[in-house]
Every structure is written in C-alpha cells, then in structure tokens.
C-alpha cells in the first residue's frame, strides 16, 4: 500500500481508476474508505484516477497525540507530499468537512497545483470564539479516558442514528489523536475568508440544507468562479454520503473544468 512522508508523519493512500487525477480527502473521524462506503468510488473511478488519502490522525496514516501536529497547514502539505510522490503537477480535489477545509488551504497555499476544487460541508470562515465551549471537543476529551462508547452513544442522540459503517469507524479510531486534532481546531481553526477573492480556480461548493448553509452560500458568492449546490433536507452526516445526488454534479463540474 503506497505511503508518503510529510513533516515526520506517514500518509497512507490508495489509487483506483484511470484518467485525470482526482484527490479525495474525507471528513473528521473518517478515512479513505469512507468514499467507498458512501458510494463515490465506483461511479468516479471509471473516468478518473482517484487518489484516496487517509488524513493524518485517521485510517492507516500516523496518529500523533500532540495538538500542534494537526495544524491545517501541515494537513495541506500532506496532500502535496502525496501528489509530489506521484509526480503529478496538478490535480482536481474533492474534500468533505475537514477535507473541505484542507481544500481551501490548497487553494490558498498551492493554487498552481489544483485545477479545480470540490468542497462540501464546511466553511472557509472562522467566526467562532475559542473561549466558547465545544461540545465535540469536550466529548472526545472525556472519551479519551472513558472509552469510545461515550462517543457512539452521544452521536446517536445528536444525529438520531448512525450507520453501522460509521460506528465501526468510530470504534477503530484513535480517540486521543482525535481529541488532539479537535483541540487544535478549537484553538487555531483557520480563516480563509480574506483569501477567497484570490482563489480563481473553479470551485464546486455543496452543503446540506439542514447543515447551517449560510456561510457556504456566502463563500460561493465571494469566490470568483464558484458553483453552489444545496442538498435539500440533508444534515451534515447525511450530506457526506449523498453520492447519488452529488456524483452527477461532480461529473458535470469536472467535465467543464478539466
């Protein structure tokens, strides 16, 4: 299984399909196989070379327990390390939630390396107060001592239900690494709002209607070249797996931008 080295950590990835390269990075608590479970890989690999990355702290990549190891600039560099190892000059990119925030970082720091960006379930703005309580951070820091069942039980309350595949991923996660990443995000979450006007590559922005979409909509209006897709009635978790709705939009967007 191919791996890359980046800032002292190992980044794991898979390659499927043939065609123009499309990098995929999952959301927090996911891994490269999330895209398979959600039904994105099979319809996309017939037209694109899919590069499915385990972000640091996830899957089979390294899982540091130091919050500073999860600086988003490092996560952006991890993607570049992979595409450098593959001798790719430019790629298209698909990221959801955490993976979407990494996408905005690519647009800021490495605009010459991305032909187009597909970003879902996230905002480029940091309008949160780091002194305000973070229920997610509190949950993971408690679970680091009490066990992962606390996370699973709480998520079932928060989201109504979770899929067996998602529950299995939670059980296999390194809770202390996840808590470290959430701690960095709480204290230092990036704000790319002032950088949007300089990101001139094509963007496809998508979000669930029940996932507080106002900031994603604002983002799409401030980007010079963006298409916006709202997924009716879907929350954050549901939108992550909405491949039947999203794949047609993704294929149309990539056909127009490659």
Task: Identify the role of each PLM range.
Residues 210-218:
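Conserved alpha/beta-hydrolase "acid-adjacent" motif
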Residues 104-109, 115-145:
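Flexible "cap/lid" loop of the alpha/beta hydrolase fold
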Residues 42-45, 51-92:
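Active-site loop/oxyanion-hole signature of alpha/beta-hydrolase fold enzymes
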Residues 9-62:
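Conserved HGGG/HGGXW glycine-rich cap/lid loop of the alpha/beta-hydrolase fold
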Residues 95, 99, 103:
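Gly/Ala-rich beta-loop-alpha elbow adjacent to hydrolase catalytic centers
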